[in-house]
Amino acid sequence: MASSSDSWMRAYNEALKLSEEINGMISERSSSAVTGPDAQRRASAIRRKITIFGNKLDSLQSLLAEIHGKPISEKEMNRRKDMVGNLRSKANQMANALNMSNFANRDSLLGPDIKPDDSMSRVTGMDNQGIVGYQRQVMREQDEGLEQLEGTVMSTKHIALAVSEELDLQTRLIDDLDYHVDVTDSRLRRVQKSLAVMNKNMRSGCSCMSMLLSVLGIVGLAVVIWMLVKYM
């Protein structure tokens, strides 16, 4: 029977050592400036450790059931149950601290940055119901932040639409102005062509008049000479 008790204590000490290791990993991750894929790999490693830790606690609970009723005092049995319960509470706290740290990027977008170690200190000492309540509060605050962000995005979208409509109007006005300029240019060219034709016709008319006057002058001169010859 002592062997069963000793095996339980060995298993408990292993679980306790693992919990301390996980705490160290979480603290190291909290104080590290690593982001991106490396941070995700660290988080995955911690999550695997927490899963193993939970399995060890299940094994401790099963071992307690096996030694129940054997030569071990009720007080010792209750003490060991409390020891397992404390480790399970610690497992929940570590899991929730890890979940809180995964919100870091989202928090930095929506509002004040909540560091993972701050989340760990806040959930320390809380029971499961308190931890769940704290998580719900954080999620509610994040949802409110998302609503505010959505409002800002919608406002920006409306401004962008108004600017786009104004640009379309200005484009149409410029197109209309180009059309009127083309029409005016075409009319100006027609007027210039008409003026050129009129100028050419006027020049032709002046030449004919000059020839007519020349002929009349020659005829008049011939008449004068004839009269002078006749009456001399």
Curated annotation (Swiss-Prot):
Transmembrane segments: 209-229
CDD domains on file: SNARE_Qc
Location of this chain's protein in the cell: Golgi apparatus, trans-Golgi network membrane; Prevacuolar compartment membrane
Superkingdom of the source species: Eukaryota
Keywords of this entry: Coiled coil, Golgi apparatus, Membrane, Protein transport, Transmembrane, Transmembrane helix, Transport
PANTHER family referenced in this protein's UniProt entry, alphabetically: SYNTAXIN, SYNTAXIN-51-RELATED
Miscellaneous comment text of the record: SYP51 and SYP52 may have redundant functions. The exact location of the SYP51/SYP61 complex is unclear, but is probably on the trans-Golgi network because of the likelihood of containing chiefly VTI12.
Name of the protein this chain belongs to: Syntaxin-51
